[in-house]
């Protein structure tokens, strides 16, 4: 698999998106290391083989829980990679979705898939570091991220950035794992394939996320630990939902 055929086009799109959305932060392509085309290809192949059943149910739950079906505006998937969740969200919402990922080598594949499904006009991509998001304050109507936050070196800073970018009244849904509507049989099969590498202390993670919210002064938040019937032996993951308060309405009559 080669992702570089349309990379020039993708970079131009990234730069255009960046020019529209921010002016004070510069884009820099990552230098070598783990953010490579080879890494992107490996993740895409792994996702196809293992995680493909996860995204449809997750998108379905997100749209239902946050009433996104008729909502318009901007949605951001932070750390979206190949953008499979965005494709599923495009099928169910009217939002324009932005794939914000630190590895731009995903973007050619992402655009190809979006165009294949008829959503090329409803998506954008931009290289983004969670610790310094390239968006204006109060920019996004919804921010989601699956399977990324545990890689962030400074989680307090990253979650603070997400909060900054949310519009007043908007919500973020950040986590790892599955949605409660994913059949237990499928979840069990995925965990069995993943083995020990996806074992983590959910209780410890919940405490960590709660501490981050308190440090940032975010009061309107909720930690979800999906536990559908029959899933007692399956780790369904953990999700953090938090809201940015709406702007206060000034009573000019007073």
Predicted features along the sequence, with ranges:
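A short SAM/SAH-binding and catalytic strip from SAM-dependent methyltransferases
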Residues: 142-154
């Amino acid at each position: 698999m080669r992702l570089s055929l349309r990379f020039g086009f993708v970079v131009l799109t990234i730069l255009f998106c960046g020019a529209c959305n921010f002016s004070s932060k510069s884009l820099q392509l990552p230098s070598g290391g783990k953010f490579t085309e080879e890494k992107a290809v490996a993740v895409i192949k792994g996702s196809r083989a293992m995680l493909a059943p996860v995204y449809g149910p997750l998108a379905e739950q997100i749209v239902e829980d946050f009433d996104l079906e008729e909502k318009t505006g901007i949605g951001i998937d932070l750390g979206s990679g190949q953008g499979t969740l965005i494709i599923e969200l495009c099928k169910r919402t009217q939002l324009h979705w932005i794939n914000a990922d630190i590895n731009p080598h995903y973007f050619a594949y992402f655009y190809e898939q979006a165009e294949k499904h008829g959503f090329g006009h409803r998506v954008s991509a931009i290289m983004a570091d969670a610790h310094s998001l390239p968006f204006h304050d109060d920019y996004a109507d919804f921010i989601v991220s699956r399977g990324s936050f545990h890689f962030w070196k400074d989680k307090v800073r990253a979650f603070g950035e997400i909060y900054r970018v949310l519009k007043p009244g908007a919500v973020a849904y950040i986590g790892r794992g599955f949605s409660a509507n994913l059949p237990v049989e499928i979840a069990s099969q995925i965990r069995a394939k993943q083995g020990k590498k996806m074992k983590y202390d959910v209780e410890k993670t919940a405490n960590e996320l709660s501490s981050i919210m308190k440090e940032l002064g975010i009061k309107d938040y909720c930690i979800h630990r999906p536990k559908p019937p029959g899933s007692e032996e399956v780790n369904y993951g953990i999700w953090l939902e938090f809201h940015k308060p709406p702007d206060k309405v000034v009573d000019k009559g007073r």
